[in-house]
């Protein structure tokens, strides 16, 4: 016959296993819903060399400690957070997000990422959107006259 203590221990083991399984199966960052209207926003800031340089300085000050200098999510503080910072150099993720969605995420934040709406101006946040686009590796250029596979 199972004692009350055994039942309690068994329940804790099952609960712990369920928590570990949910973390292991990658449920951490699949959904970060953005309002439809926010995703439709267009970037009013041009990606000029001056704006990109300003955004790089902001990124190095506000973002690189977590997301890493090149955006791989490997900054010196990345290991302190659960879930870990996203790789901003992930082409499939970044190319799937319109500028308005990136801007909204920078603006609103989500634990553990802070909101930057009171730390950075609208222009600075849009500059960051342009800079983040530069972190995504470009596909190799096709050679003229190359045969398609």
Model-derived segments and their meaning:
Residues 2-11:
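Bacterial N-terminal signal peptides that target proteins for export
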Residues 11-18:
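Bacterial N-terminal signal peptides
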Residues 20-30:
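Bacterial Sec-dependent signal peptides at the C-terminal "C-region" and cleavage site
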Residues 49-72, 78, 102-108:
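Sequence/structural segment immediately N-terminal to covalent heme-attachment motifs in c-type
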Residues 31-34, 76-81:
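Short, flexible, mixed-charge acidic loops at enzyme active sites
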Residues 80-135:
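Extracytoplasmic electron-transfer domains, predominantly the class I c-type cytochrome c fold
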Residues 72-73, 122:
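Short, non-ligating residues that shape and space the ligands of small metal-coordination modules
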Residues 28-58, 142-143, 147-149:
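Electrostatic cytochrome c docking/interface patches
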